[in-house]
Amino acid sequence: SVGFKAGVKEYKLTYYTPEYQTKDTDILAAFRVTPQPGVPPEEAGAAVAAESSTGTWTTVWTDGLTSLDRYKGRCYRIERVVGEKDQYIAYVAYPLDLFEEGSVTNMFTSIVGNVFGFKALRALRLEDLRIPPAYVKTFQGPPHGIQVERDKLNKYGRPLLGCTIKPKLGLSAKNYGRAVYECLRGGLDFTKDDENVNSQPFMRWRDRFLFCAEALYKAQAETGEIKGHYLNATAGTCEEMIKRAVFARELGVPIVMHDYLTGGFTANTSLAHYCRDNGLLLHIHRAMHAVIDRQKNHGIHFRVLAKALRMSGGDHIHSGTVVGKLEGERDITLGFVDLLRDDFVEQDRSRGIYFTQDWVSLPGVLPVASGGIHVWHMPALTEIFGDDSVLQFGGGTLGHPWGNAPGAVANRVALEACVQARNEGRDLAQEGNAIIREACKWSPELAAACEVWKEIVFNFAAVDVLDK
């Protein structure tokens, strides 16, 4: 015998190591595991660790050519999920040498690439990742970050205001540019291409970029404020995407946009590097995220996708609203909003944060609240998200009975009123409606908006809630 014993052995004999002390350089993962009936949780957790690192289903002789102890993932702790039958949180530690430096693509391919189709598991969800500083430092991260963006735009002490141009598809480039101009002239900081506006027959990208740039400069000249429009550079190839970003830079506009999940992390990181080198801000839309993160027991939680985006690079990212038409439970949302903005975030299970995360010097990302929000939500949004955020009202601007510019005026007046009231020490949660009503007295545009949307509510329970 040469010391190689062929055959199949239980994963837990090699990959379940409850005595393991995690290292500062390990990438730590928290998986929500639902094993098949009859599979013990230790075996399920060990299987996840094995299949997402060095293991396969049988012993192979080439295992003897390397040091498995150095390279294997380890399931080092298992907790039962309170209130759920047959669900466990399995904590897995991965040695840093398993991952290519500066590659979110490789990190995800390793950790979630194969294991989610594993037969011994009924369902699997990646709840959180701890990225060690040693790995964080291999990433450029956001092209500019929150402070540099404020300096570029010369806007301080309040959230920024945006608007997605609707109808999202079907407008000609000239009419699209007109809608952009009216919104920006009315007082918004940004307007936005919808995520599926790329380069379709009714509006080719180059025409849209030109008319939007014209709208931008006209609105800037009239208002004396710096304006931006998120020009969506997402395309079918990376080369085409960069070509669009180059054209945006040549036009002198401040910001471009990318759909990072449909476009992919490799494309996103390439674009983020281009944006830093050329002074462009980068707005990130999370189209397709709910396919991955909506189910509570299977997939990847958005806080992981948010961390991945901060590493890959983006200056803004959509992060739910807590109050509008799209998913977003308050404590969970605030948990990943902090992970986007702050340098250091403590473990806090009450907000779904499984690990303490130290971002060292990686710039922060502005969370974007968008989806079914309007002027009545302004006090809540100002209080929940604070100054370092972008509040985006699509229908809540363009749906104004008097048109786009008055819709923009209404939002800007409501925001300024809320910020002023907060700075005076008033309680936005308690007095929010009164603050908006007072502001209506000297803004007919706001009064008209308040009248239109006074009855609108989206009362559905959040699907993804904290474990009780």
UniProtKB/Swiss-Prot annotation:
What reaction(s) does this enzyme catalyze? 2 (2R)-3-phosphoglycerate + 2 H(+) = D-ribulose 1,5-bisphosphate + CO2 + H2O; D-ribulose 1,5-bisphosphate + O2 = 2-phosphoglycolate + (2R)-3-phosphoglycerate + 2 H(+)
Check the UniProt entry and state the signal peptide residues, or none.
none
The record's section on Pfam families has:
RuBisCO_large, RuBisCO_large_N
Quote the record's binding site residues for Mg(2+).
192, 194-195
Compartmental location: Plastid, Chloroplast
The positions annotated as site (Transition state stabilizer) read 325
In the record, N6,N6,N6-trimethyllysine modifications are located at 5
What does the entry list under GO cellular component? Answer: chloroplast
N6-carboxylysine, modified sites: 192
Q: How is it modified after translation?
A: The disulfide bond which can form in the large chain dimeric partners within the hexadecamer appears to be associated with oxidative stress and protein turnover.
Give the matching SUPFAM superfamilies: RuBisCo, C-terminal domain, RuBisCO, large subunit, small (N-terminal) domain
Task: Write down the EC number.
Answer: 4.1.1.39
**Quaternary structure, from the entry:** Heterohexadecamer of 8 large chains and 8 small chains; disulfide-linked. The disulfide link is formed within the large subunit homodimers.
Write down the HAMAP family for this protein, in alphabetical order: RuBisCO_L_type1
Q: Which family does it belong to?
A: Belongs to the RuBisCO large chain family. Type I subfamily.
Further comment: The basic functional RuBisCO is composed of a large chain homodimer in a 'head-to-tail' conformation. In form I RuBisCO this homodimer is arranged in a barrel-like tetramer with the small subunits forming a tetrameric 'cap' on each end of the 'barrel'.
* Listed name of the protein: Ribulose bisphosphate carboxylase large chain
Give the gene symbol: rbcL
